[in-house]
Regions:
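Long protein-protein interaction modules used by eukaryotic assembly/scaffold proteins
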Residues: 2-10, 48-60, 64-91
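Short non-domain terminal segments
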Residues: 21, 38-40, 70, 74
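Terminal, regulation- and interaction-focused segments at domain boundaries
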Residues: 1-32
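Short, contiguous, helix-prone interaction/anchoring segments in small proteins
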Residues: 23-55
Length: 91
């Protein structure tokens, strides 16, 4: 019997229109919280979703264009407990 795949659980899904300045402020707030606390919290009404990445993340960037619609995506994934691997140096 093949191993079962883990079930995908959607913890947050939200879309809204923002100005480019509002979006930039959101990205800056996420970056500030990650640097200071190692996590950030999305608040939607009374619900809160804490996003706490591991030390090591995989980052993907994608920019696409279809007709006059442009899409730029930033995605980062991690495994719980993943630590940054030591970097090799030469002396």
């Amino acid at each position: 019997m093949p191993p079962t795949k883990p079930v995908t659980e959607v913890l947050l899904k939200h879309k809204e229109h923002q100005s480019a300045q509002e979006f930039a402020a959101t990205l800056e707030k996420i970056a500030q919280k990650l640097r200071a606390e190692g996590q950030f919290t999305f608040v939607q009404g009374t619900e809160q979703v804490i996003v706490a990445p591991s030390d090591q993340v995989k980052v993907s960037y994608e920019y696409t264009k279809k007709g006059d619609k442009h899409s730029f995506e930033i995605e980062f994934d991690w495994y719980e407990g993943a630590r940054a691997q030591g970097k090799m140096g030469i002396e």
